[in-house]
């Protein structure tokens, strides 16, 4: 998890939070909301990836550390705060959600690549009842379930998936 946390994020806000579900009781609870029952039941662990819509509240913690570690001055931090406060105030709730989804997606790919490099497998799951997850895990309303990630060792190879070629996806101007 710490290795995945170095993933880049918008303004370095790191809006991801997660719940590691690795007990039979926890997996049974998550199973009530996870449409992928097989992965839920057979994985070593499931991660519930959450997006924190109150990410700006971590400003002092994140940028205070940058000052303490000598990466920026207090003056630069405060100038950055002023600019970001204006941006945050002008940002709609929907845009905040989009930014959090985007950043959590980057974290997920970082995590999946690290898991694979360590010899394990993962499956990223978007098919689940987000409202039910919020209820089951009694999440604060600032936290939104983004995706589930199954982790373990695969018993057999998955069927190959097909991919479109870049030439069918790209335009040049």
What are these regions (language model features)?
Residues 1-173:
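Acidic, surface-exposed loops and disordered segments
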């Amino acid at each position: 998890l710490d290795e995945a946390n170095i993933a880049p994020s918008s303004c370095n806000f790191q809006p991801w939070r997660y719940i590691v579900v690795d007990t039979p009781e926890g997996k049974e609870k998550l199973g009530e909301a996870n449409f992928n029952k097989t992965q839920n039941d057979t994985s070593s662990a499931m991660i519930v990836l959450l997006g924190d819509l109150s990410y700006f509240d971590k400003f002092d913690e994140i940028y205070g550390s940058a000052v303490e570690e000598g990466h920026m001055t207090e003056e630069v931090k405060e100038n950055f705060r002023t600019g970001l406060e204006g941006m945050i105030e002008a940002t709609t709730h929907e845009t905040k959600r989009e930014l959090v989804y985007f950043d959590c997606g980057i974290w997920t790919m970082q995590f999946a690549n690290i898991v694979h490099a360590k010899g394990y497998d993962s499956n990223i799951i978007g098919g689940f009842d987000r409202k039910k997850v919020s209820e089951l895990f009694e999440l604060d309303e600032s936290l939104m379930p983004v995706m589930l990630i199954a982790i373990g060792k695969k018993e057999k190879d998955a069927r190959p998936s097909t991919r479109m070629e870049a030439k069918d996806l790209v335009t040049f101007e």
